[in-house]
């Protein structure tokens, strides 16, 4: 057992923590020992002195303690972090297809009891994002352990790239930066920022330095397959295409034509590159999706009979959910107005704050206003390498629906 400074929490926080939720807010702390520094591991106790868990302490954050262990006998040394790495990796090896090991989320924060940490594997490159100060302090022990775990399982690692260029780090009192992680386990001569991966039989070039988030969105892996199954012979419009993943899967599935839109020039160029290297016919175009859909509606243009809506999160806060609701409703309404009877709509939200019930409400309102009836074909969530903890609703964020206009 490790001797740690103590934090005593309220009864309400104790019940939440014992129920499996790892976050303790500053307002829920009754007492904290003197001398605790930001990023320290603390022992969390109830007002009666009962052990609740061990967690990262950060007074600069609203989430003041992030519990990551409920075993009072844990010692937080290199061996502990390597065990955590092994547990996360072995879960993926059990639930994912073998062909997905080279494009897989290895660590999904709280769902892996590693608060604020994301690790994606793109071939032999790891892309890492650290959003909690405690994990930043223990990053070296964990990442070195992770590299060893992967190599022990014959999974190569040539370099690790840190994508810590996100503003949310400042809320934890950390600086933004990006660059290669250096370790005696890694050869600087092997460093690279672009790597090719294969997902669902399609080759992509991933830019871990400049791509969105960690470089590529892995959470829609199986949703793309579902979308492709009904695309044969269809004229498809893929909105917010990013690197073209939905467009390429549907094109591979036999679509008659595929147009992929994104407001980002870099995204459009990467989509065109990915289409070319796979020998797939996809027209990649730079456009504002809202304006494009509005213009099609004005022209009464019904040439597309399958539309994919995979927008970025319109809200990252509960405070802006109402504005996000309007944004989601607007694009879904426009898509429904454009689609002919018998056409298909794939629509998604990647915001936790836009919950499943609220998203369904939005879809129903959009359909009512567009004067259409929807037939639900399928509902899906994020891929299993992004696991959902039933006690931590924040780990559930991705909703994916397939509808037909009837």
Predicted segments with their positions:
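Conserved class I S-adenosyl-L-methionine
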Residues: 233-242
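Conserved SAM-binding loop of SAM-dependent methyltransferases across substrates and taxa
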Residues: 243-256
